[in-house]
Amino acid sequence: LVSKYCDHLPLYRQSGIYARSGVELDRSTLAGWVDQADQLLDPLVAALGRYTLAAAKIHADDTPVPVLQPGRGQTKTGRLWVCVRDDRPIGSSDPPAAWYQYTPDRKGEHPQRHLRQYRGILQADAYGGWGKLYGSGQITEAACWAHARRPWWDLYLSSGRDGTSIAAQALGRIAELYAIERDIRGQPPDVRQAQRQARAGPLLQEMHAWLSQLLGRVSAKSELAQAIGYSLTRWQALTRYCDDGRIEMDNNAAERALRGVALGRGNYLFMGSDAGGERAAAIYSLVQTAKLN
C-alpha cells in the first residue's frame, strides 16, 4: 500500500521488484491484498471522514483520474475529491487530516452528497458544483486568491514579463496581501482578524476600486476583462478572510493534498475500475493524513 499510494509504484513494478529478489508475486495477488487491506481499513477511513468534517473550516478540491471501463478497452475520467482539515496556521494543536472520495464523474451531486451534513466554512475554487452547498445557508463560501492570481500571472507572462503592465500591478497588489499573511501565520484567529482589517482592509478597498475602474476601460471580451471579472464577481468570497481569522487566503492546503494523486496518475496511468478508485480514495486518506502529521 505504501509503495503504491505513497511512493507511486504501480503493482506491476512492485511485482517486478519482488521477482528480482526471487519472490514470485503476481500482480493479481498484490491487487487482492490491496482490496482486502482496504476492507479492513474502512472503519478507520470512515472515522477520519467524520473527524475532518467536524472542523469549523475545511478546504476542498478535486482532480481527474483516468479509469478503465471493463470490457471496452477504453478509459473514462473519474474524479478524486479531497477535504482537508488543517488549522495549524491559526495556532491550533488539532491534528490535520485529509479525507478523499472517488466519483465516476464530476457532477455537482457528488460533493453535495459528501458534504450534506457539513456545517461551517468551505474554502474551494470556483467550481459550480459547490453552489448549492452555499445556497443552503449552512455552509459559508471562502474563495481562493491563488485562483484569482492565476489569470494575472498568465497575462504577465504573455506581456513578456513587462513590469509596467496592468498584470504586473495586479500581481504586486496581491503580493502585498500575501506578505501580511506571512507576518501573521500561526497567530490566533482574533489577532489575524485584527491585523487583516487594519492592514489588508485598506489594500482590498483600493484594489476593488482599481479593478472596477479598469473594467470600464477594457473590452468585455478581452483576457484582461476576464481576469478582472474573476475577482470582482467573487469579491465577497475572496475578501471574507479579512473578517474571519480562521479563513486562509487561498485553497493551497487542498491543492497540496492532490499532488500525490497527480504523481501516481503519471506512473500507473489509470485505475482499473470504479471500485479501484474507491480503494485509492480510502488509502490516500490515510497516507496523506499521515504525511500531514
Located regions from the model:
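Catalytic center-proximal scaffold of phosphoryl-transfer enzymes
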Residues: 1-293
